[in-house]
Amino acid sequence: MLTRKQYELLMFIDERLRATGISPSFDEMKDALDLKSKSGIHRLITGLEERGFIRRLAHRARALEVVRLPENRNDQTLPPPAKAFAPNVIKGGFAASQLAGAPVAGPSDSVTLPLYGKIAAGTPIEALRDHSNSVDIPASMLGSGNHYALTVDGDSMIEAGINDGDTVVIRSCDSAETGTIVVALVDDTEVTLKRLRRKGTSVALEPANKAYETRVLPPDRVKVQGRLVGLLRRY
């Protein structure tokens, strides 16, 4: 039987994975459960893992997978969440209309997406508008809408599980909920992949690496170009 806090944390992780495909950060879990320190989150996660409700994914920073839910929520083995991805900071310099390239059908279980170039996962840089490359993506990774891919160059999102050299899959959109990892166009000149947060009347572009600072900007300086929906990694 789970404690109340274990249950609340399990439900929060499950809801976030199903909504974004990405595990919430320890800070997000701490805030969601109104705890004062992350050590409490570590203890709750260990308890959930020992009871077989979640498991940690190897070789990924803080990546978690929900295995089953409690009996009062149909306790049963769950299918893997929609590709639990580990996103990282990305830069792209293109407008949403330029990125809305329709996927091209590839093999029966994959889709070919335009690979628009290498994006710095650090300080925002001007996007590389390379339309000559493409990448095959598992069809199960994609939902509705238009998608494109970018290659990560940098380490500003490593605590979100996004590493240098990863390929991130982006769904084109012009808005996103707070806490979502997005491709954001800043001042119509530079594009970056960061976690979007709304702070009062301002917009914060938050890295997942303590070596980088969060940028807080007026909303008229930031345009959402897409949201992270998947990640591919080669070993």
Swiss-Prot record:
The active site is at 156 (for autocatalytic cleavage activity), 194 (for autocatalytic cleavage activity). The record marks 121-122 as: Cleavage. Its EC number is 3.4.21.88. It comes from the Bacteria. GO terms for molecular function: DNA binding; serine-type endopeptidase activity. Pfam families: LexA_DNA_bind, Peptidase_S24. Keywords: Autocatalytic cleavage, DNA damage, DNA repair, DNA replication, DNA-binding, Hydrolase, Repressor, SOS response, Transcription, Transcription regulation. GO terms for biological process: DNA repair; DNA replication; negative regulation of DNA-templated transcription; proteolysis; SOS response. It catalyses: Hydrolysis of Ala-|-Gly bond in repressor LexA. InterPro entries: LexA, LexA-like, LexA/Signal_pep-like_sf, LexA_DNA-bd_dom, LexA_repressor, Peptidase_S24_LexA, Peptidase_S24_S26A/B/C, WH-like_DNA-bd_sf. Transmembrane segments: none annotated. Residues 26-46 bind DNA. NCBIfam families: lexA. Represses a number of genes involved in the response to DNA damage (SOS response), including recA and lexA. In the presence of single-stranded DNA, RecA interacts with LexA causing an autocatalytic cleavage which disrupts the DNA-binding part of LexA, leading to derepression of the SOS regulon and eventually DNA repair. Homodimer. Belongs to the peptidase S24 family. This is LexA repressor. It comes from Paramagnetospirillum magneticum (strain ATCC 700264 / AMB-1). The gene is lexA.
